[in-house]
A protein has these predicted regions:
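Small-residue-rich hydrophobic transmembrane alpha-helices
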Residues: 53-113, 150-169, 263, 276-340, ...
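Short alpha-helical transmembrane segments in multi-pass integral membrane proteins
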Residues: 1-23, 81-146, 179, 190-246, ...
Length: 457
């Protein structure tokens, strides 16, 4: 098998510069993915009414809950491929590629079937408002039909990121993003398809991005080449992906579960609050993706350096990623805080909806950097091969805390503000425990390296 290129080497050179160059296209890609959702929300809110806006928005937490397990497996593929790449294990990289793509297709089909047939029942469990549940069900069913393509893109983009390539997935999303916006306008304004048109535009554009990124892997030479004729599961690669990815997916699912519970509580305030919350959440997503690019950089850089046994780089990776995520989080969060009212008017002209969205942004935006710190510390742990620890910490620090909060504090002080404040509290507590765990793991790995050096002497 042809030798791997060193173009994606993340183990040497100026680390901060490499992290920024890696993260910028990744952040841009995430922004484009958010523009898919923003285009949905803006077009629907402007041209189909607040009921349609609430129908689309009420699906967000549920969709995340159902897909995050497989997104976690995509992260597992990223960690395993990056570690093999850092160790210059060509065979390991190739087997990871073949296995990851196969898992994405199997998982995507599974999610499509489950999501399509369970859509209405799941929305009922979430107490979706009666005036929007039929529209929400229609949107959700169409969305899940495209799930195989969504999963295929996520896995393939993760594989490319593992070897330092964040630019070409950006191009794929840029093309798909233009298609999504055009189709949104055509389906909703011209053909009056409302939420069905929005969902259809989304899955068609995601199909384009999935096909494009798959072609990139097929055209790769050497270890990263995707051989579509020999797709299959390699046991060792699958077990490693599951070992890292399953806990990561469960962690994301835990967060989504708590968000579903909070969304259910928000639904109880009616469609106006649901619509405002949807618009604000969409705006906050832009802050999150700006930070999350550095969290994803942390896991890829850490994984490659662990594979190359360059433990001396791990502290630099952690410090630089934490610095970047804090600066970006504060800058974007404060910008959204002060410009919230203007930004929300892009989503709706209904002043009651804008006011409802503003009440959320005023609480969450300035503290959002805590979420970035939490994710970056968890990524550093996963990159070092410890994925169960952040899962357990998140289970207790986020899901359990938020559930207890809703069952106690929210019952005593029933308001949207009481719900929203649970987010920054859980971020701060979870980040603190992640940091303690990371320091313990860091000491363990350094002691192990010293022992190996002593034995080799």
């Amino acid at each position: 098998m042809a030798q791997m290129s060193q173009a994606g080497d993340l183990t040497s050179g100026p680390m901060l510069k490499k992290i920024i160059l890696f993260s910028l296209p990744l952040a841009a890609s995430s922004f484009l993915q958010l523009l898919f959702n923003a285009a949905d929300v803006v077009v629907v809110g402007r041209f189909a009414g607040s009921a349609a806006l609430a129908a689309v928005g009420s699906n967000g937490a549920l969709i995340n809950l159902l897909v995050n397990l497989f997104v976690g497996l995509a992260l597992g593929a990223n960690v395993v491929a990056a570690r093999c790449y850092g160790a210059k294990d060509d065979q390991g990289v190739h087997e990871t590629v073949q296995t990851a793509v196969t898992l994405s297709l199997v998982g995507g089909v599974l999610m499509a079937v489950v999501g399509f047939f369970a859509a209405h029942g799941l929305l009922e469990l979430m107490s979706s408002p009666e005036d929007v549940i039929d529209l929400a069900t229609l949107y959700l069913k169409i969305y899940f039909i495209g799930m195989p393509m969504t999963m295929l893109y996520n896995f393939n983009a993760s594989l490319l990121r593992a070897v330092g390539d964040t630019r070409r997935p950006l191009v794929c999303l840029a093309v798909a993003g233009v298609i999504n916006v055009v189709l949104n306008l055509v389906f909703v304004i011209v053909f009056q398809m409302s939420v069905a048109g929005v969902a259809l535009a989304t899955i068609l554009s995601q199909t384009v991005s999935a096909i494009m990124v798959t072609v990139l892997l097929v055209r790769e030479e050497g270890a990263m080449h995707l051989d579509l004729r020999h797709l299959g599961i390699h046991k060792k690669a699958m077990l490693q992906i599951i070992q890292i990815g399953l806990p990561a997916g469960l962690q994301s699912t835990v967060f989504s579960l708590s968000n579903v519970v909070i969304q259910s509580a928000i639904n109880s305030f009616g469609s106006t609050v649901v619509a405002g919350n949807s618009a604000a959440s969409n705006l906050e997503g832009f802050i999150y993706t700006g930070m999350n690019a550095f969290a994803q950089a942390a896991v890829t850089f850490t994984s490659q350096n662990v594979g190359a046994r360059r433990y001396d780089n791990l502290d630099r990776v952690m410090r630089n990623c934490l610095l970047c995520v804090t600066v970006v989080g504060l800058f974007l969060g404060c910008g959204a805080y002060f410009g919230g009212e203007v930004l929300l008017h892009f989503y709706s002209t209904d002043e009651a909806v804008v006011a409802a969205g503003l009440s959320r942004m005023q609480i969450i935006c300035t503290a959002y950097f805590l979420c970035g710190i939490m994710d970056t510390l968890a990524s550093c742990l996963r990159g070092r091969g410890y994925s169960v620890i952040p899962m357990i910490v998140s289970l207790v620090g986020s899901c359990l805390l938020r559930l207890v909060w809703i069952a106690t504090i929210f019952r005593m002080f029933r308001s949207t503000g009481t719900l929203y404040i649970s987010y920054p509290i859980s971020w701060a507590l979870t980040a603190g425990v992640h940091l303690i765990c990371l320091l313990v793991v860091r000491k363990k790995m350094n002691d192990q390296l010293k022992e190996e050096s002593r034995l080799a002497a």
